[in-house]
């Protein structure tokens, strides 16, 4: 197995070291080592089944929910090991939020969707909750569209609005990292453009790690890009460099459409 072509990252917030992941006896990730820089957007690209979503879900231990899952290696969040019994998984998922491929608002009001995580954390002060709702919806570029119907069902929103609501819900608990798993795959081009603009704005406050099949999207929104193939991190670098002058032939073949 060839060595990963990788770039040095300054001020990493997440550090992955020799990470291997198994679904039962099947090895899905092979000794991944990768640093994710703070307040940047990192895209994970590669063909279906390459392990990019598995890697993403390792970062906040969503894979704990999978029967037979097993992790080896280390994941550090600001220097603290994630894969240890001492780690409070609920607190980890507050610090490392998740936006899924399919928008998944709860069958509750828009307001209740945004404050869901805060309620779990024990926040009851209405003034604090009201402020969090407005700030999060403004950050998600949604406030002006929904401010007059906060107590209506979130299920009446458009697909693009629902996905931005899910982003608002993720950032309402003030995470350090936001994971996004194909957040635009079910959206029309106009809604996709809104979410991409939002990702660019959110990098000022949060570290964003996004899985995408859309290489043009990766090129547009990310600062760094990692290419995975068959569970191996093949190449990782500054996005412009990786797309314009990839150092690995396999990377070049993928981004030029020779396979995928």
Curated annotation (Swiss-Prot):
The keyword Translocase applies. InterPro entries: AAA+_ATPase, ABC_transporter-like_ATP-bd, ABC_transporter-like_CS, P-loop_NTPase, PstB-like. It comes from the Bacteria. Its EC number is 7.3.2.1. ATP binds at residues 46-53. One of its GO terms (biological process) is phosphate ion transmembrane transport. One of its GO terms (cellular component) is plasma membrane. It is a peripheral membrane protein. Signal peptide: none annotated. It is found in: Cell inner membrane. One of its GO terms (molecular function) is ATP hydrolysis activity. SUPFAM superfamilies: P-loop containing nucleoside triphosphate hydrolases (SSF52540). Keywords: ATP-binding, Cell inner membrane, Cell membrane, Membrane, Nucleotide-binding, Phosphate transport, Translocase, Transport. It holds the Pfam family ABC_tran. The keyword Cell membrane applies. It catalyses: phosphate(out) + ATP + H2O = ADP + 2 phosphate(in) + H(+). PROSITE patterns: ABC_TRANSPORTER_1 (PS00211), ABC_TRANSPORTER_2 (PS50893), PSTB (PS51238). Part of the ABC transporter complex PstSACB involved in phosphate import. Responsible for energy coupling to the transport system. Belongs to the ABC transporter superfamily. Phosphate importer (TC 3.A.1.7) family. PANTHER family: ABC TRANSPORTER I FAMILY MEMBER 17. This is Phosphate import ATP-binding protein PstB. It comes from Syntrophotalea carbinolica (strain DSM 2380 / NBRC 103641 / GraBd1) (Pelobacter carbinolicus). The lineage of its organism: Bacteria, Pseudomonadati, Thermodesulfobacteriota, Desulfuromonadia, Desulfuromonadales. The gene is pstB.
């Amino acid at each position: 197995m060839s060595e990963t072509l990788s770039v040095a990252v300054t001020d990493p917030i997440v550090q992955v070291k020799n990470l291997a992941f198994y679904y039962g006896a099947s090895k899905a990730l092979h000794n991944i080592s990768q640093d994710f820089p703070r307040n940047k957007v990192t895209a994970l690209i590669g063909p279906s089944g390459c392990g990019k979503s598995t890697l993403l879900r390792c970062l906040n231990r969503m894979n704990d929910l999978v029967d037979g899952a097993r992790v080896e290696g280390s994941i550090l969040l600001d220097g603290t090991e994630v894969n240890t019994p001492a780690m409070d998984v609920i607190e980890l998922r507050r610090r490392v939020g998740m936006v899924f491929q399919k928008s998944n608002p709860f069958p509750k009001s828009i307001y209740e969707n945004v404050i869901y995580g805060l309620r779990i954390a024990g926040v009851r002060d209405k003034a604090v909750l009201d402020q969090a709702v407005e700030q999060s919806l403004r950050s998600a570029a949604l406030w002006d569209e929904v401010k007059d119907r906060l107590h209506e069902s979130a299920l009446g929103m458009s697909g693009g609005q629902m996905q931005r609501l899910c982003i608002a819900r993720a950032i309402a608990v003030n995470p350090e990292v936001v994971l996004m798993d194909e957040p635009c795959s079910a959206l029309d081009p106009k809604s996709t453009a809104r979410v991409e603009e939002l990702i660019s704005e959110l990098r000022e406050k949060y570290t964003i790690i996004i899985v995408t099949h859309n290489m043009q999207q990766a090129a547009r929104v990310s600062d760094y890009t990692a290419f995975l193939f068959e569970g191996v991190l093949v190449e990782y670098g500054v996005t412009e460099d990786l797309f314009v002058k990839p150092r690995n032939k396999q990377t070049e073949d993928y981004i030029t459409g020779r396979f995928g």
